[in-house]
Amino acid sequence: MMYPYMTLDDGTEIIHSELISKDGTEHVIVHFERPTEDGFDDARCELPSYTWTDVHGFSKEELALFDEMVRANAHLFYKYAACGGIE
C-alpha cells in the first residue's frame, strides 16, 4: 500500500509505502512522480539503504535535492509508514 506524503510546487507527488519487513529489517519505499506531456517522470528510493531505482526523467540536480529531502524526513517516512499514512 502507498500513502500520500506531499506535493511539491512543480507538481511532483511524493508517496511512501507501508513498512516492509525484509531480512529482519524494516524498509520503506519513497516514490516521486511528476506529470509530463508524455507521461510521468518518476524515481524510487528505498530506506534504510537510500538506494535509488527506477529513475526516469529527473535531473541529477533534482535527484540530489530529493535525496537530501528523503534523508531529512526519513524518521517521518518510518513513522507514517508504521501508522498507515499521515492522519
Map each language-model feature to its residues.
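Short linear motifs in intrinsically disordered/low-complexity regions
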Residues: D10-G11, G24, E68
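Acidic, low-complexity intrinsically disordered segments
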Residues: H56-E87
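Negatively charged, low-complexity tracts enriched in Asp/Glu with abundant Ser/Thr
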Residues: M1-E18
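Generic detector of leucine side chains in alpha-helical contexts
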Residues: L8, L19, L47, L63-L65, ...
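A short, structured beta-strand/loop element
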Residues: H16-F58
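Structured catalytic/translocation cores of nucleotide/phosphate-coupled proteins
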Residues: P4, D9, F40-A43, E61, ...
